[in-house]
Regions:
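Amphipathic alpha-helical coiled-coil/heptad-repeat segments
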Residues: 1-6, 128-184, 344-399
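Non-catalytic DNA-recognition/assembly elements of restriction-modification systems
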Residues: 1-20, 30-42, 127, 131-138, ...
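Basic, amphipathic alpha-helical recognition segments used for DNA target recognition
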Residues: 8-12, 67-128, 211-216, 247-254, ...
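Sequence-specific dsDNA recognition surfaces
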Residues: 8-58, 69, 75, 79-83, ...
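Short, conserved phosphate-binding/catalytic loop or strand-edge motifs used
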Residues: 117-122, 143, 167, 186-189
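Intrinsic disorder at enzyme termini
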Residues: 172-173, 179-198, 202-203
Length: 399
């Protein structure tokens, strides 16, 4: 390892306030040319057509003054806010890419909400080698990162393929491709030919029927305004769910962040454990069963099945119709559908024996998908750990 010299970051990087480069309008469009940046994970938050105040003295590092997150930038840009510093490397001492990579492994407590660069972060000392040695280290880091990125891209494609496969499984299941041809003896009010003319052909033992004929559907209740009035939650003991908690639950909802007290319960409704929850606003067509008695707002619909339909069958069918239900939502800031849309949703109905068979076939395939996805997620986590390991070795002179 050649001799490395210690410097404070402020000796290696000069800073500039971002104020002249802050975007004036948040009317972003992918059709516009200039990216608007944040130093956080989102990085490019949109594109602007503004032509003044574009930063173009490149390359630079943008530094989030509150979280200490950084991004390396080698293209003209504007910024979202003043919550950052624009850092320029002293190229007589350090390569911009080298110091950027070095900053990725600095351990720093940023739990206090304040600006850090001037008083604290810039005082951190790091060791750097000669410029030729820096070039070699950067080249080796990027060679290894390129190999790692190729692997990560393959893993991400695998996850995308799994999502496509899941939808294909659901599509085939509700077109009767897994059928064992049990005869449906139940006489119900079937959907008309007009209502089903654009729907897939299903086995002759099956019939199409509106979801409202298979169970009771009802919106949750949260009548009081404002909805976050503290008195609703005083002495809370009744779980109050949000659409995000339905989405996060996957199958059974047992976790929640809010609880109604008696005042809250009086203006709501307590739904029993086992109710199928279906979201109709923000997160559309997310489903999960209540693992507890709970209240929920009118952005969630509760479904209670009749004796001739299995709730798991309905849950999987709603999952298969997610894109279709999204299409019913008007083009507003927050997507939503109404109760009528769910009530009139046409469901392929079959005997209870067949429903059990469909559920088993779906869940067997989904279990395989889940196991593969867990393996992929572990590999992605390992790839990120490997990235940190590469950087650590690089700056210990071990690459």
């Amino acid at each position: 390892m050649t001799e490395w010299t210690e410097y404070a970051l402020e000796d290696l990087l000069s800073y500039e306030q971002p104020t002249p480069y802050i975007v004036e309008s948040t009317d972003y469009s992918d059709n516009y040319k200039t990216p608007v940046l944040t130093a956080g994970k989102s990085f490019i938050i949109g594109y602007t057509n503004e032509t003044n105040g574009i930063y173009d003295k490149l390359p630079v590092i943008i530094f989030d003054d509150f979280t200490t997150s950084t991004q390396y930038v080698n293209f003209p840009f504007k910024v979202k806010s003043s919550a950052m510093k624009i850092l320029t490397a002293n190229t007589n001492l350090v390569l911009p890419k080298f110091i950027f990579y070095r900053m990725q492994i600095i351990e720093f407590d940023h739990s206090t909400h304040k600006r850090y660069w001037i008083q604290q972060y810039s005082k951190i000392k790091v060791k750097i080698p000669s410029l030729p040695e820096q070039e070699k280290i950067v080249a080796k880091i990027e060679e290894l990162f390129s190999e790692l990125d190729n692997g990560v891209e393959t893993l991400k494609k695998t996850k995308q393929q799994l999502a496509v496969y899941r939808q294909a499984v659901l599509k085939e299941a509700f077109e009767g491709k897994f059928t064992t041809h049990f005869v449906c003896e139940k006489e119900l009010e079937w959907a008309s030919a007009e209502e089903t003319k654009s729907l897939p052909t299903i086995p002759e033992e099956w019939q199409y029927i509106a979801l409202s004929k298979l169970g009771d559907l009802g919106r949750g209740k949260s009548k009081h305004r404002p909805r976050n009035d503290p008195k609703l939650f005083e002495d809370g003991k009744y779980p109050f769910l949000q659409t995000s908690e339905v989405k996060a639950a996957k199958r059974y909802i047992t976790e929640y962040s809010k609880m109604y007290g008696e005042v809250g319960l009086q203006q709501s409704k307590l739904w029993p454990k086992g109710t199928l929850c279906i979201t109709i606003a923000a997160n559309i067509a997310e489903t999960a069963f209540l693992g507890i008695d709970a209240c929920f707002p009118d952005s969630v619909v509760g479904f209670t099945p009749y004796e001739y339909i299995l709730p798991e069958y309905v849950k999987h069918f709603i999952e298969s119709q997610k894109l279709r239900l999204w299409a019913f939502a008007p083009a507003t800031a927050q997507k939503n559908i109404n109760l009528d849309t769910l009530e009139n949703l046409i469901v392929p109905y079959c005997s209870l024996e067949e429903q059990n068979n469909v559920i088993s076939e779906i869940e067997a395939r989904m279990t395989i998908c889940d196991n593969i996805e867990k393996t992929v997620d572990i590999a992605l986590q390992q790839a990120e750990a490997m990235r940190q390991s590469i950087l650590k070795k690089a700056f210990e002179g071990e690459l």
